[in-house]
């Protein structure tokens, strides 16, 4: 069989139908020629289509690059020329926006024509588009079309607003609205917010931990759960894990606890042996805890620091022993107590601030010697309340007990970058944190009672100048937290309040979910009263008593000894009816009657003896018969006076007066 120049695929032979086969099978159609496909033509058509699409794409890119060059050139010319009046500048800006809009429309038309085959008619040629643009440039007398000009002006205003917000980070602070959550009457010393921003947990000096659900709360702002996980110990720190399913609780005890989202205990760290000198050989802390921190990358690992001069790493799966121990030391090698600790953003560094004013940073895998050690970061003898890493991980902020806030570069840890003073603090857990964009640093100030109001101070990271302040309440600001997803600020105060600051336009969810809900009305208690059937003509035995007042019913019940449970009066006289009489009826009365009686003998012993003198004289039996012959007459010794006895005594026995 011969083939043509083009390759063809045939489905059957080209011979005609066989009549004998058709008669045998009962139907015709055998031997028809199958459809042929020209593969080379199909490949050629596909190649041409691809080349055409590539050419249009390149032309669109060239047009876009040309427009960008024209914009840059126009901008340079405007910068070189003197500034025109406001009206002409606005007009030129509107005309340029119109040109940009028309050019973008033409490009969109070209792209739509290339992609959509159902559109009828070709797009406008470039010459006509250029003429329309030229007429718009030359016709400065008439107004421009309203829709294009308004949209362009709005876009320019939005761009200017965005540029202003980027230049001034103060405008991003969400403080236009606030809500107040009443925790109690004592200091709110701990705040925690889960990563999604759905639940807030607060702890205070009143030993209580309260859970707040923004989605479930209404305008009454009441906590849905309250508990005391550490009994009679003040809550010092609360922190959600990175997954949000566990909460780390640190109190004044030596054992940290982990609870779940509903407040049920998951694990409790073991207490170490306080009689061992080397704290690295104990299985847990032996003194009061200060603060805690979850590992940012590893699930189930957290860190605690204590008054036993150690920083310990733990795992939730192994509560019987710590994972590793860091022992802060002074430059002389002596023990020093860490007051706060934290992980870096990548979890590779462990930072701790100590009571001698030093800040020590270890590599997480090397527990012996610190990687960085600055010995005079803050005044010795003060408690550094917080250390926090920035979101980029290069800067460390420390809130000292010497009323200062300092900024450090971890890459050059030899001196502070900036230092801000006049920030009083009275609590060992005063916070500091970074804004979500890393451009601001936030901390709170403390005040004495009745001596002013606590403030939330915002400092710019580049210059460390105070750029903004918020007066919170007539008490100290202890805790502060700026959530990056919600863009809301949570503050814990010294008078038992937890405040949430937000902006409806800049914030997401959180407090915005509960402020729009109306407060639920209290449900009235439903009481079922007995239905009375009034039948005035019924017999007295079938009549129901009428309902009386409560006072009269109580008086009647009082007279009934069974309903009033009146005690039985005491039995007078001998007992009756199975009851023993009052006299001698109890054990105490029996003892008083028979044993504790007054048995004093008032008789005269001389008279009792002389009562038998006559009988003894008439009938002597014991002594008198022995002296009847030798001494028939009784003779008694003579009584000597005391003076005679004293005279007969020797001189050395006489009493000296």
From Swiss-Prot:
User: What ranges does the record list as Low complexity composition bias?
Assistant: 82-105
Sites bearing Phosphoserine, chain numbering: 624, 641
- Where do the WD repeats start and stop? 183-222, 230-271, 284-324, 333-372, 379-418, 424-469, 472-511
Task: Tell me the segments the record calls region Disordered.
Answer: 1-21, 43-172, 543-584, 634-657
Linked residues for Glycyl lysine isopeptide (Lys-Gly) (interchain with G-Cter in SUMO2): 299, 593, 599
Q: Where is the composition biased (Basic and acidic residues)?
A: 45-78, 543-568, 647-657
Q: Say which family it is in.
A: Belongs to the WD repeat GAD-1 family.
Sites where N6-acetyllysine occurs are at 455
Alphabetically list the UniProt keywords: Acetylation, Isopeptide bond, Phosphoprotein, Repeat, Ubl conjugation, WD repeat
Top-level division of the source organism's lineage = Eukaryota
Know the name of this protein? WD repeat-containing protein 70
Tell me where in this chain the PTM Phosphothreonine is found: 582
- What is the scientific name of the source organism? Mus musculus (Mouse)
The record, for Pfam families, names: WD40 (PF00400)
Start-end of Acidic residues biased regions: 106-119, 150-168
Which portions of the chain have biased composition (kind: Gly residues)? 574-584
